[in-house]
């Protein structure tokens, strides 16, 4: 964004930077201006925020300007929810209260504690914990089918990207992958006695193949120890590297999942700049055509300010590349530093999206306020779909 600052409109922030004091009795600071491009809101051309906690001044390019007291005006005249206290699009929006249907009891239960202890003892990472999934209690306790499930996260617990909805910790230089992780993960999962498992990972832009080789080793190790197990892989976009997609698709997995996350218009706001709508569609399309019978899956968060027409456009684009499974869930803000919730979508609206999705050709749609990418991924319908697709592919070949 800094490289693009010569284009207009733009805004500048005056940031206090500590300066070496001339005496021990006083504190000095100087101000440095950072110019950033205003992509979505051309009317927002300049912000001078010398005291971000107290007030800011907006100049709309005319001779007059407006001074806003953020302490008394949480939203301010900003074209995004949450005001300007924590930066663009962030901070708590006090006008939005979490509805009852999103309130969850704290995870508890004997089975939950057993799974938690097992994961800790085996030194495994789970997206359930790292991403603060609201369904962790239901899934680890067995849910409706009585089978405790967890989504295992490989390639470490530190992501190289900084998507503005995600609670997973980030770093430009995370630790190198554990070479024993594929085997240890396979041994642990084989001991659980489950017949469907979801493997996901952080983004690893620091690795030449984006981590696809390590991911594939994990799948092959699981299939070798337990051939009948069904494996779903929820992957990164591998920076759009289709050879990396091939590596994983041909590792023996049964479901290839990659999330577009949100509608096209909101991509640059919600996701890391290295991700993109067209890039994600390309990855999903290639996974489908790369191997006969491959089931593809994606997920969209609602409540970020998308419109119905934009959601339908995304669904149409996904059906055009023959995505089989789609999930919808409510975006929940993990911390005040993350994106604010624009809207709490009602359960009735989620039911509408499920019905609409199935009417336009998706083979399975999971849609609900607390649904997440891997929510009840291995339920009977999906497992039956995997078996049928495998038989069809074998018959064709």
Curated annotation (Swiss-Prot):
Family statement drawn from the similarity comment of this UniProt entry: Belongs to the radical SAM superfamily. Lipoyl synthase family.
Pathway: Protein modification; protein lipoylation via endogenous pathway; protein N(6)-(lipoyl)lysine from octanoyl-[acyl-carrier-protein]: step 2/2
Cross-referenced InterPro entries: Aldolase_TIM, Elp3/MiaA/NifB-like_rSAM, LIAS_N, Lipoyl_synth, Lipoyl_synth_chlpt, rSAM
Keywords recorded for this protein, A-Z: 4Fe-4S, Chloroplast, Iron, Iron-sulfur, Metal-binding, Plastid, S-adenosyl-L-methionine, Transferase, Transit peptide
Subcellular location: Plastid, Chloroplast
Organism (species): Populus trichocarpa
Protein name as annotated: Lipoyl synthase 2, chloroplastic
HAMAP family reported in the protein's UniProt record: Lipoyl_synth (MF_00206), Lipoyl_synth_plantC (MF_03129)
